[in-house]
């Protein structure tokens, strides 16, 4: 005797609206908006649970545990909206570029700084320089625009200078004389 999939779930089309995770776990509970009846009295302290029993949700934490998403209430720990403003996104506005500074001035600013401290200098159209405090003094590394992307020294290509700086804050610079340093603190323009 052969059983059909529809017989396994009780109806021929009822299982199509049920997410796979609920079909796979028979102990899971799926709430619909009709099942969830959270209400407060005039005093604001009486709450009704999804099953209609006020004693099941006597604490105010029950309200915070369910989030209304579409037609179903979902546990808030599973789907919490992110605050996009807290995510750090590197952009060109986060880096400082010295406009009128030569190598000698950069070396003077970096001579008593910590290893990995750096500054960026503008060198004209499509070119800049990264001046970095290394173990043997200050190292100057060319940053060039190749027509499509930026490159620092002989390293990989980047879509912006800030993405290159962000990368080298986490990965060592592949530059002779930089002793495989990572970028630490950028000096702000004076």
Swiss-Prot record:
Residues 96-190 form the SH2 domain. Pfam families: SH2 (PF00017). The keyword Magnesium does not apply. SMART domains: SH2. Disulfide bonds: none annotated. Keywords: SH2 domain. The keyword Aminoacyl-tRNA synthetase does not apply. Expressed in PQR, but not AQR, Q neuroblast descendents. InterPro entries: SH2 (IPR000980), SH2_dom_sf (IPR036860), SH2_domain_adapters (IPR051846). Interacts with abl-1. Functions downstream of migratory protein mig-13 and may play a role in the control of Q neuroblast migration during larval development. PANTHER family: HEAVYWEIGHT, ISOFORM A. This is Protein soem-1. The lineage of its organism: Eukaryota, Metazoa, Ecdysozoa, Nematoda, Chromadorea.
